Amino acid sequence: LEDKLQDGTLRYGIEKLSGKRTIVFQVSGTIHLNGDLKIKNGDLTIAGQTAPGDGICLAGYPVFLEADNVIVRFMRFRMGNKEDVSADGADAFGGRYHRNIMIDHCSMSWCTDECVSFYQNENFTLQWCLISESLRLGGHTKGPHGYGGIWGGMKASFHHNLLAHHDSRNPRLGPGVNSTKENEIVDMRNNVIYNWCGNSCYGGEAMHVNIVNNFYKPGPATPTGTSKRGRIIAIDKKVSDSDKKSYPAIFDTWGDFFIQGNVVDDGQINGAADYDRCMKATKDNWEYGV
């Protein structure tokens, strides 16, 4: 479980070895990373399910996926907010600009930017993952910043994931800055989104997106008495944000969406108005949930 660049460690198998390989584990526990872990040599499978007991947890630093042909299964990512990690842009697990990637049955939590951000990839799948408890006050220079993730890609699938206890970006759907609307094809279905605060899902500029059969459950942090409680997605396009930051031209293009079968379940504990808002969004996703 030591994080050293020596034979037998996870870092050695990821950073030193190359070619087609599968990393298996003979022990279980937490690997306290000594620095960022960057997956740069592709043709790799990390088989976390081979670890005995409670499996493998990577803690302390971000993990970056920077290679093609990668499978990661049954791993836990707990970045935290160590003082020597820049909080801005630090995701528990993320990657861009690569292809043929599958992330399966993993858990990502306690990030200072987003828990899991994968966009601008090609042939990508994120499935059966638990994405929870981003750090709202984790040291980001913008202040409160507990976000789930940025999702997108060219033929990208996000299904059967749980996003829970994030302020916003549940997820934020984002295109590649150098991409085109024709290439951005994303399928988001059978996910559970629970207890958002500032926003649930939003964005989708210049993307073709399916949002199908997802389950939205407002929680204690979700504002009452507002449209956010019954919101499935806030479709957006941007030229600049509140900080006057300019966006690439692709962000000034409306996306195309197929939205159907999503359920917003509020229960009746927060009063008739909120219950009615969520029931309407479930009955007509487009009219009341967008």
Predicted regions and their residues:
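Extracellular "leader-to-stem" segments immediately downstream of a signal peptide or signal-anchor
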Residues: 1-22, 32, 272-290
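Right-handed parallel beta-helix
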Residues: 43, 48, 68-79, 97-110, ...
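Extracellular beta-rich repeat passengers
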Residues: 172, 177, 182-290
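Acidic glycine-/aspartate-rich tracts in secreted/extracellular proteins
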Residues: 2-4, 21, 28-30, 50-53, ...
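Extracellular beta-strand-rich solenoid/capping regions of secreted or surface-exposed proteins
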Residues: 7-19, 30-47, 54-73, 79-99, ...
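Soluble non-cytosolic domains of exported or imported proteins
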Residues: 4-8, 66, 182, 253
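Extracellular beta-strand/beta-solenoid scaffold signature
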Residues: 58-63, 84-95, 110-118, 139-153, ...
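A mature extracytoplasmic/lumenal domain signature
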Residues: 2, 27-29, 50, 62, ...
